[in-house]
């Protein structure tokens, strides 16, 4: 799958054929380091802050405490992700509203599709 243009118009239509296969691929390709133990494959971003990406958590990865200033939608594609609301398994859609905050872990590793209305603000290490 070609690397998408990182910035797109808010009115552009985008298609990502083979996205689930790409999420499960073990080759590094377009995956980049994001946080310790977490890689990111950016799908798109717009000048006003909307963005989406695949995130690949290695076993034991922790994403530091952060605040959501816009909606975040997270679809767990494989594995399990844990936040203060509980353990979220593959197939679960997690919606974090503006003003919510949390820390996320994945003891066994996982891959998620994350869609952000606005960038998150990291408040912890």
Each PLM stretch: what is its role?
Residues 39-42, 75, 103, 111:
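Residues located in well-ordered beta-strands
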Residues 98-123:
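Ligand-binding loop in jelly-roll beta-barrel domains
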Residues 35-68, 87, 97-101:
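Conserved short histidine dyad/triad with adjacent acidic residue
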Residues 82-106:
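Short acidic-glycine-tyrosine-enriched beta hairpin
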Residues 50-54, 74, 110-111:
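Structural motif
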Residues 58-61, 68-83, 90:
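Glycine- and acidic-residue-biased ligand/ion/polar-headgroup-sensing regions
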Residues 62, 92-93, 111:
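Residue-level marker of beta-strand positions
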Residues 1-49, 125:
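A short, N-terminal "cap"/entry segment at the start of jelly-roll beta-barrel domains
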């Amino acid at each position: 799958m070609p690397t998408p243009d990182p910035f797109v118009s808010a009115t552009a239509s985008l298609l990502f054929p083979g996205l689930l296969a790409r999420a499960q691929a073990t080759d590094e390709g377009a995956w980049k380091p994001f946080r310790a133990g977490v890689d990111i494959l950016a799908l798109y971003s717009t000048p006003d802050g909307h963005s989406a990406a695949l995130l690949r958590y290695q076993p034991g990865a922790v994403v530091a405490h952060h605040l959501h200033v816009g909606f975040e939608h997270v679809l767990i594609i494989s594995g399990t992700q844990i936040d203060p609301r509980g353990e979220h398994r593959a197939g679960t859609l997690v919606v974090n509203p503006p003003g919510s905050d949390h820390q996320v872990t994945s003891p066994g590793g996982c891959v998620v599709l994350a869609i952000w209305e606005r960038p998150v603000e990291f408040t912890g290490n």
